[in-house]
Structure formats: C-alpha cells, structure tokens
Regions:
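Substrate-recognition/cap helix-loop segment adjacent to the acidic, metal-dependent catalytic center
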Residues: 153-172
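Short acidic, S/G/P-rich loop/turn micro-motifs used as interaction or catalytic elements
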Residues: 105-106, 150-152
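A phosphate-binding catalytic loop at a beta-strand-loop-alpha-helix junction
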Residues: 211-225
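Long, low-complexity, compositionally biased polyampholytic IDRs enriched for Lys/Glu and Gln/Arg
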Residues: 1-46
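Residues at the starts of beta-strands that form the adenosine-phosphate
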Residues: 174, 208, 235-238
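Active-site-facing substrate-recognition patch
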Residues: 44-139, 178-208, 218, 243-247
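A short, conserved beta-to-alpha structural element at the edge of catalytic cores
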Residues: 226-249
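Short glycine-rich phosphate-binding loop at a beta-alpha junction
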Residues: 138-149
C-alpha cells in the first residue's frame, strides 16, 4: 500500500509539474504574441504618421507637367484621330482602340469582348504600376476615377475597373461617393471637360488619393478634381491615365 501511495503521489506531482510547464509555456507564448502585436502596432502607427512623406516620395520619379505639381503616370501617347487617321501607325491604332474600348461608350457599339479585353489590359497596367510604386502601401490609398460626361457613361467606364483594382490592391474605392449631376464633354473630343458632380465630402477627409482617367489632355480636369478633394481634406498623391494627348504643332 505504501508503494502504491508513493506511486500515486509521484504521478500527481508529475501531472502538476506538467500542468505548470504547460501554463508557463502558454503564458510565455501569449507574452511573445503580445510583444509582436505591440511591435506591429507601433510599426503601423509610425508608417501611418509618415504617409504624407513616404507616399509622395514613392512617386517622385513620375512625370511632371508645366504649371502643375501633380505627379502623373501614363502608358501611351494619344494622337488626334482626326489628324492622323489617314497616316496612323499601328501603335496609334492600338492606343485608340484601347482607349475607345475601355471607355465603353454606349453610342460606339463596343462589343462586350472588346471592352473586357481593353478593361483587363488597363487593369494589368494600372495594378502593375501601383504595386511597383507603392508596394503594400496601396492599402492606404483611395482610388478616385474622374467622372465621364454622364452618370451612365461613368458607370460603364469606371465602375467595374474601380471595383477590381481596389479589391486586388486593398485600396479604398471612392466610386460610390461621387455622382454626376450635369453633363459635359471630353476635352480630347472637343468638349469642356466640365460636369456638375455631387460628392460625399465626409468620405474624403484624411484620404490619400490616386486619381485615374482615360486620357489626360491639358491636365485641367485632374487639377480641378485635385482642388475639390483637397478642399474636403484629402491629399492627392498622384494621377494615372491610360494615355497622354500629344499635341501637333
């Protein structure tokens, strides 16, 4: 009986020691996790504090234009179709078709296949550029697509594009927070480029903005959008367009 009792005591002591060891290990693991989470929290806080500096630094090598401090990236030169349609190069035609098919204007009889092909091409270009430029910092950015001349055209042109890019890059999507109230016309097609729009101004406060449009001509539309958003408390970091109009002099 004494031997049996001794073994029971030994077993209890061993079990108690094992429970204590498990408790200590779990406590140490919890402490390590807490320290790691605190370290990550401090890193993110520092990263967020430095965003105004680091995000602008990311685009320091992008294009600058006369009379504008807005950094701009584009992928193709856009020549006037009406000037060059009879002597256009294959590159000009490729750019025209990419822009036209992306814009998906309901009056132009663009097929679903043509639009989807152009959409995927532009998404790949834009996402690739943003990843290379900002890395994981895309999560701090908000994508603002400049509106077309009507709400319907804006939806056909930008809604799906914005949804996909923002989902893939974990960006904020500003598309639902801007609506067209009046009509204008595209500048590179002879319009004024001015539309009447309504903004959910509270959404933009403190946001870091990437502007997007299909074609930049004079840059006035981008600058106008920049001023509006900055008046709402946003910081406009840069602009991306599919193409840049090349003037013939």
């Amino acid at each position: 009986e004494q031997e049996e009792q001794r073994q029971k005591n030994a077993h209890r002591l061993k079990a108690a020691a094992e429970r204590e060891a498990i408790f200590i290990a779990e406590r140490e693991a919890a402490e390590r996790k807490r320290r790691e989470e605190e370290k990550e929290r401090q890193r993110r806080e520092a990263e967020i504090r430095n965003l105004p500096t680091t995000l602008y630094a990311c685009v320091s090598s992008w294009n600058s234009h006369i009379n504008s401090t807005l950094k701009h990236k584009y992928f193709f030169n856009y020549y006037s179709y009406y000037t060059h349609k009879n002597d256009a190069t294959s590159s000009m035609w490729d750019t025209w078709k990419t822009v036209w098919n992306f814009k998906n204007d309901p009056s132009k009889n663009i097929s679903s296949y043509e639009h989807t092909t152009a959409l995927n091409k532009v998404i790949d270009l834009v996402e690739g550029e943003l990843r290379r430029t900002f890395g994981s910092k895309t999560e701090y950015l908000t994508l603002v697509c400049l509106t077309a001349s009507t709400q319907r055209k804006t939806e056909l042109r930008f809604k799906k594009f914005a949804e996909i890019v923002c989902k893939d890059l974990k960006m904020n999507n500003a598309y639902p927070y801007i609506r067209v109230a009046g009509e204008g016309g595209a500048m590179h097609e002879g319009g004024t480029g001015v539309t009447s729009k309504s903004y959910d101004s509270s959404f933009f406060k403190g946001k870091y903005i990437v502007l997007f449009d299909d074609v930049r001509t004079s840059g006035n539309s981008l600058e106008r959008e920049r001023r509006i958003l900055e008046n709402y408390g946003a910081k406009v970091i840069c602009a991306i367009t599919i193409a840049q109009t090349v003037r013939d002099y």
